[in-house]
Amino acid sequence: MANILRKIIENDKGEIKKLEKTAKKVESYADAMAALSDEELQAKTEEFKQRYQNGESLDQLLPEAFAVVREGAKRVLGLFPYRVQIMGGIVLHYGDVAEMRTGEGKTLTATMPVYLNAISGEGVHVITVNEYLSERDATEMGELYSWLGLSVGINLSSKSPAEKREAYNCDITYSTSSEVGFDYLRDNMVVRKENMVQRPLNFALVDEVDSVLIDEARTPLIVSGPVSSETNQLYHRADAFVKTLTEDDYAIDIPTKTIGLNDSGIDKAEEFFNLENLYDIDNVALTHYIDNALRANYIMLRDIDYVVSPEQEILIVDQFTGRTMEGRRFSDGLHQAIEAKEGVPVQEETKTSASITYQNMFRMYKKLSGMTGTGKTEEDEFREIYNMRVIPIPTNRPIQRIDHDDLLYSTLDAKFRAVVQDVKRRYEKGQPVLIGTVAVETSDLISKMLVDAGIPHEVLNAKNHEKEAHIIMNAGQRGAVTIATNMAGRGTDIKLGEGVLELGGLCVIGTERHESRRIDNQLRGRSGRQGDPGESQFYLSLEDELMRRFGSDRIKHVLERLNADDEDIVIKSRMLTRQVESAQKRVEGNNYDTRKQVLQYDDVMREQREIIYAERYDVITAERDLEPEIKAMIKRTINRTVDGHSRNDQEEALKGILNFARQALVPEDAISLEDLKEVGEVTKRSVNYDAIKVYLTELADNVYDRQIKKLRSEEAIREFQKVLILMVVDNKWTDHIDALDQLRNAVGMRGYAQNNPIVEYQSESFKMFQDMIGAIEYDVTRTMMKAQIHEQSREHVNERVSTTATGNIQAHQADANGQEIDFSKVGRNDFCPCGSGKKFKNCHGRKQF
């Protein structure tokens, strides 16, 4: 272990030496740049662009370009980047993570690589954790970029598509991670290229990169729409049932936070819902509602996982920042289950139209880099998932903060009393205190205890984060006491007030350890910025969440031996700190495995998503007639359907093909059974199915030509073809995403049968994807052949093609011959005799199977 640590430290030292060498090159240009007039310095940007166009690489331009930014910052902002900031900028340019301590000037550091990469003209995205920071940084640093001749845009969720397009077309665009992700998804749902807002993704520089790429990585970005509201009743029924259970009826696995019914719970469910077998295949949907109701009632905790707003809405609490996540909802029906639990109006369940994880979103950039104060603990994940190294940058001045060993109490009550006593002592001498809590309810409890102790203070949690920047800025003033849930207020510096240095600087008190060491380090890092003095102290109890889940029995025995009756007894030792960090490493390992699994599932979907989005983009941008593509779809649909029916009994096969032709290809009176028998040279023993394929293809080509002639102009034809394909693709893709969600839930259970769920998911999702392609081609064929076409102006084509853009398409979907079809002899995997081209189990046999 010691050898591994030594190797890591030596590697870091080697990197620092290389960075210092390049930084010195940058510094060597300082005098030359200082001698230039404003106009000459500003002209450098155009010179760099020209040199880049002439073949010089950005790496070659780096020393001079960084020097231009340094001199520009001095003249425009009154700031001159230190050597350590130049080193951080070099790390960022090369696509790695720069670990820079709080207060070391990350925002100014970013200006150098952002400027250099903007020279290519392909766009730079600066990603922040919230819109307040996007606006603040774009306004402050935008002065410098604009002065140097670069355009700066801010991409906010409230902006119109035209404003977003303008922001993305700038050299430098400030945005949040979620907004970039949603814009990407929305761009792949539009009908026309001119409605897209993004350019191809080039270079992203992510501020607080650990928060975005690690903490958010388990949360997929989802664009969804409502489904039938009849399901609301099931949420209430499942909730009513779950509330009748006792602790003996279900089992909770605390480390993984999963829950399931015991045998007694299953018996009660079967009695409550009047079922013979709860886990019968017909009850799959019901078990989903029961599972969600169990999680909502016995796993999800009010004021910790969510809060109920005054408007009677359930708001998610971000476990890493303590902020409420406006507009976000738990997926898979869990949010509705919580609404039923809390007795607030149950909002309509939604169906996913498009989704992507943060991991796959950011891996699409040509180059990705990031800054954070705490990234080293997650280095393996950055390297394995994003191919980024974490390089710690030395501080400009030595750190003077004193980090005290943890204090452990036996009960929560004893711990909180000790916290209040410590705060009171420091408040009385005027030292500012920042109290970090993990949950909203903890901050409320401590606030009440401080009020009782007569200590004035500010509370910063999920309930009032609008004021957070202002509260955090004043947290370093003499006598200030501030309670912050996790690291709300991250990104805003705490500057020390007059006379505070002499009192020991800002004291940070943690009321419990977070499950991630990184979050603890972020809290500690609020104190001791830029070489200021400071202190940090964590208070723990055996009743803390982390200690209950992963705490060592050894610690509990030590406390019991010391004094079982005195709850105010306290342990302070290095052994305790090591035990706590060991528990945190176990949790971090679990969380990493979870994120990795999310990525493995999304990687399967990513391949399919990229195929669909590439095909979509090809259709949207096509200036050509799409007739060859559509006729190829029609031909494949005919071949697929005829081949499918050819495996059946001869008479049934011919009837199935006839139904298909009448329903999807030609008018009813244009083809008869006798026609097929004649073309197929039918005898008692054989049918020439190849001849039938050729015959049907010729008929379909004639119908296609007649349909197209109804459109008078080339533009109208192309418009019709595009909307036809996009409408079908979007509908089928949405259904496919929904089916993949259900498949993922189903294969999870197969792990118990010794099958690898990921392998099963890959295999079955591939088959489903092939089926979806077949269904797309069938629907394009049927709609093309059966549409009632009439001219309609371009403006009237509805934008939301995924559900309503029928534009000038109105398809006949009734059974062509109006006769009842006998399904009694049809096998589960046979093609449906209705002529849809689907297997019976996925068509008219769906209810039966």
Swiss-Prot record:
Catalytic activity: ATP + H2O + cellular proteinSide 1 = ADP + phosphate + cellular proteinSide 2
EC number: 7.4.2.8
Entry membrane topology: Peripheral membrane protein
Residues annotated to bind ATP: Q85, G103, E104, G105, K106, T107, D493
GO molecular function (one): metal ion binding
Cited InterPro entries: Helicase_ATP-bd, Helicase_C-like, P-loop_NTPase, SEC_C_motif, SecA, SecA_CS, SecA_DEAD, SecA_motor_DEAD
Compartment(s) where it occurs, according to its Swiss-Prot or TrEMBL record: Cell membrane; Cytoplasm
GO biological process: intracellular protein transmembrane transport; protein import; protein targeting; protein transport by the Sec complex
Pfam family, one: SecA_DEAD
PROSITE patterns per the UniProt record, alphabetical: SECA (PS01312), SECA_MOTOR_DEAD (PS51196)
Cofactor note: May bind 1 zinc ion per subunit.
Subunit structure and binding partners: Monomer and homodimer. Part of the essential Sec protein translocation apparatus which comprises SecA, SecYEG and auxiliary proteins SecDF. Other proteins may also be involved.
Family, as annotated: Belongs to the SecA family.
Name under which the protein is recorded: Protein translocase subunit SecA
